């Protein structure tokens, strides 16, 4: 399934998902430093493995994917399948609604 087939996302629900599943390793705050994972501010339209001053795996650099609703929707289903060798330990969000909600939050909070 693709993002175009996903249910509408709710950014408020997505914020809760981010807080419980992502915030341990990521921030979305402009100018904030990296945590265990890279700062996600400016994520949309950026190529994987290119946030300044973050030490990425070769897999993330070499994938060279441009982050969009479509690519994030697929990536967040199973990160290790989408980018074999990624350092991200998160197993993914299996429910389409959860992925749509998280993407709605990320679109709102990372620009």
From Swiss-Prot:
User: What residues bear N6,N6,N6-trimethyllysine in this entry?
Assistant: 80, 94
Q: Where in the cell is it found?
A: Mitochondrion intermembrane space
Taxonomy, superkingdom:
Eukaryota
Residues carrying N-acetylalanine: 1
**Is Lipid metabolism among this UniProt entry's keywords?**
no
As for PTM, the annotation reads: Binds 1 heme c group covalently per subunit.
> Which terms in the GO cellular component ontology are assigned?
mitochondrial intermembrane space
- Which amino acid positions bind heme c, per UniProt? 22, 25-26, 88
UniProt entry keywords in alphabetical sequence: Acetylation, Electron transport, Heme, Iron, Metal-binding, Methylation, Mitochondrion, Respiratory chain, Transport
Main subcellular localisation: mitochondrion
A molecular-function term among this protein's GO annotations:
metal ion binding
Question: Could you tell me the Gene Ontology terms of the biological process aspect for this record?
Answer: mitochondrial electron transport, cytochrome c to oxygen; mitochondrial electron transport, ubiquinol to cytochrome c
Q: Which InterPro entries match?
A: Cyt_c-like_dom, Cyt_c-like_dom_sf, Cyt_c_1A/1B
A Pfam family that the UniProt record links to this protein: Cytochrom_C
Metal-binding among keywords: yes
Q: What is the role of this chain?
A: Electron carrier protein. The oxidized form of the cytochrome c heme group can accept an electron from the heme group of the cytochrome c1 subunit of cytochrome reductase. Cytochrome c then transfers this electron to the cytochrome oxidase complex, the final protein carrier in the mitochondrial electron-transport chain.
Q: Which family does it belong to?
A: Belongs to the cytochrome c family.
**Name of the protein described by the UniProt record:** Cytochrome c
Q: Which organism is it from?
A: Spinacia oleracea
């Amino acid at each position: 399934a693709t993002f175009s087939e996903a249910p509408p996302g709710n950014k408020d629900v997505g914020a809760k998902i981010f807080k419980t599943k992502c915030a341990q390793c990521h921030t979305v705050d402009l100018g904030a430093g990296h945590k265990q994972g890279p700062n996600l501010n400016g994520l949309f339209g950026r190529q994987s493995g290119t946030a300044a001053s973050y030490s990425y795996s070769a897999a993330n650099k070499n994938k060279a994917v441009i982050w969009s609703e479509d690519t994030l929707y697929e990536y967040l289903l199973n990160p290790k399948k989408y980018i074999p060798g990624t350092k991200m330990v998160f197993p993914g969000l299996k429910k389409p609604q959860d992925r749509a909600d998280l993407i709605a939050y990320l679109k709102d909070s990372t620009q």
